[in-house]
């Protein structure tokens, strides 16, 4: 099985459905024998440029180890889901398990607040 980093952005009006989407996607990966190494829900964030006249989106990051068939099925699901504005699936060499720089930065700021 190969390692992948998956980021997808959800329409801000569909933020309540993100947990269900994550459960569905992680469920399909684990059913096929895959492993979720890292799952981060970055929440609603400002976009660098407007997409479909939207300025914010709900971001989710996953690092997984899964068969290629599951990843292609996941990409098809992203493509036909209107709530997913953009997605990126990248193959990585190793499993990434440590927190992303974005989450580490938020953890640093949290104690000071």
Swiss-Prot record:
One of its GO terms (cellular component) is cytosolic small ribosomal subunit. GO terms for biological process: translation. One of its GO terms (molecular function) is structural constituent of ribosome. CDD domains: bS6 (cd00473). InterPro entries: Ribosomal_bS6, Ribosomal_bS6_CS, Ribosomal_bS6_sf, Ribosomal_S6_plastid/chlpt, Transl_elong_EF1B/ribsomal_bS6. Keywords: Ribonucleoprotein, Ribosomal protein, RNA-binding, rRNA-binding. Belongs to the bacterial ribosomal protein bS6 family. Binds together with bS18 to 16S ribosomal RNA. This is Small ribosomal subunit protein bS6. It comes from Pseudoalteromonas translucida (strain TAC 125). The lineage of its organism: Bacteria, Pseudomonadati, Pseudomonadota, Gammaproteobacteria, Alteromonadales.
């Amino acid at each position: 099985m190969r390692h992948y980093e998956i980021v997808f952005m959800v329409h801000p009006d569909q933020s309540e459905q993100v947990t269900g989407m994550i459960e569905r996607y992680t469920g399909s990966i684990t059913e096929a024998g895959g492993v979720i190494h890292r799952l981060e829900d970055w929440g609603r964030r400002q976009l660098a440029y407007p997409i479909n006249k939207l300025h914010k989106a709900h971001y989710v990051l996953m690092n997984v180890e899964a068969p290629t068939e599951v990843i292609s099925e996941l990409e098809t699901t992203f493509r036909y889901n209107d709530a997913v504005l953009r997605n990126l699936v990248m193959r990585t060499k190793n499993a990434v398990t440590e927190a992303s720089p974005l989450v580490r930065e938020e953890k640093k700021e949290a104690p000071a607040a």
